[in-house]
A protein has these predicted regions:
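A short alpha-helix capping/helix-coil boundary motif
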Residues: 17-22, 56-59, 161-165
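Mobile, glycine- and charge-enriched loop segments
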Residues: 13-26, 145-147
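Glycine-rich, proline-tolerant flexible connector loops at the mouths of alpha/beta enzymes
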Residues: 1-17
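Short beta->alpha connector loops
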Residues: 2-6, 28-35, 57-58, 127-135
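Active-site acidic/histidine proton-transfer and metal-coordination neighborhood
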Residues: 22, 28-121, 142
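Short, contiguous strand/loop micro-motifs
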Residues: 1, 26-28, 64-66, 98, ...
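Acidic/histidine-rich catalytic cores of soluble enzymes
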Residues: 83-175
């Protein structure tokens, strides 16, 4: 979930080339996209990917309707800029987007409804939706073609100690 280069001083391009792997997407933060869209698009192109994924907002109140509406607006703006450069913007969920913001709606509902499918689509993470108690199959059906990537991992049942604001239980290693 960290932007490239923030996880140590590794030569990611060389590592990827040496292993023959393909980069499906890169993660970026919304502020960087809005401040430096050309730089971000060039980075995506150097990895031969068409997807830039925003993995949520740090210290963001997903229970605040005005804030969520503003987020949708900013996502649309960033997505439009990226689309003009041949890149697609995806939003990756965690459990916090499923907090209620009003009458029967959660923040994720608002993001689906208020973002333009031409500019913003989704990398759906079923682990976090399940953690939030969401009917993941129904939500995947609702997203339909807007679900461009699917992030799947095993869901643990052990409770963990202190962690970030998102994590509530341990994930389990696949395999």
């Amino acid at each position: 979930g960290m932007p490239i280069g923030k996880t140590a001083k590794l030569d990611w391009k060389k590592l990827i080339a040496d292993t023959g792997l393909k980069v499906v997407s890169i993660h970026e933060d919304l502020g960087s996209i809005l401040r430096n869209p050309q730089e971000i698009m060039e980075e995506a192109k150097t990895f031969s990917t068409k997807y830039i994924v925003i993995t949520g907002m740090h210290r963001f109140d997903y229970s605040n309707m005005a804030a969520v509406l503003e987020l949708a607006q900013k996502l649309n703006k960033a997505g439009k800029i990226l689309k003009e450069g041949g890149i697609s913007l995806l939003y990756h969920n965690h459990n916090c987007e499923f907090r209620k913001v009003g009458a029967g709606k959660c923040a994720y509902d608002v993001l689906i409804e208020k973002t333009n499918p031409e500019y913003v689509n989704f990398e759906f993470d079923s682990y976090w939706a399940t953690e939030a108690g969401v009917d993941t199959i129904a939500l995947m059906e609702r997203l339909g073609e807007r679900m461009k990537l699917y992030h799947i991992n095993d869901r643990g049942t052990r409770m963990s100690g202190p962690g970030g604001q998102i994590l509530k239980s341990d994930s389990m290693e696949l395999g």
